[in-house]
Amino acid sequence: MLSIQVKDYMNHYPVTFTSEMVVEEAALRFLKTKQIGGPVIDGNNRVIGFLSESDVLATMLQTIYHNEHVSDVAALMRKEVLSVKPSDSVIELAKSMFQNKPKVYPVLDEDGILLG
């Protein structure tokens, strides 16, 4: 049976965020790209976290309600990132998606650099 790999179907231009980005800008990026999550990268394209649309919206609602300053992405991002390699099986990834909550998995090389 032919093995279908992640690299054959990954998005080569995923929506990304930086840790310094303000939450409002991240929310606009989610709206423009119609994505539900994306990796937070450093200046070397290394993944340092993950940001979900639901985390951004929940924070914005809370800060608006309490009339507080909205924080930056670094305060919201998840530091433990579930990721895949380009050579991973799409079938195995699909099984993981049924078992785990995330539906977006960054594709990383061996050095943690974002590929898709």
For the regions a protein language model found, what residue spans apply to each?
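Conserved glycine-centered beta-strand/turn positions repeated across beta-sheet architectures
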Residues: 48-49, 116
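Residues at secondary-structure transition points
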Residues: 43-44, 55
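Tandem CBS (Bateman) regulatory domains
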Residues: 1-13, 52-102, 114
